[in-house]
């Protein structure tokens, strides 16, 4: 996980460290965001669980999420049949990490919000669009080619996939459903 929201980082760290034999490592990235990584405590991994592997890793493996790269991520199929309240929790966690709330500048002086989730995984973005439909929200999927500069040379990046919610009705419905933390919550309140 990487984030600039200290409360979200603290919450993630607390949840990981509830698993025996697990700790977290924090790094500051060039962007100023922090990266928090789950890892085992040396020498205690198998002993803690009577020779069995850590339950956190078992859950990650069970749902096919182990060792996934950003462009390989998706929502496990069984999650689509979760109750609506759990879908809202999942969407909230996804928006806390890679979602955004923007306010459009409008000539009328009103600044209506729109919400966006962005990833290099088309499958993940389409899965999120599907989850949004479960809570009565319609999102639009678009893509954009990205680029970056490395040692003064402009290079082509991966395609970025986005699901955007812009209709006032759906924005209101989604904001009412999400339980956001950190700077995303502050932006929602100020909007």
Task: Write out the residue ranges for each language-model feature.
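Internal intein/HINT superfamily modules and their associated LAGLIDADG
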Residues: 1-191
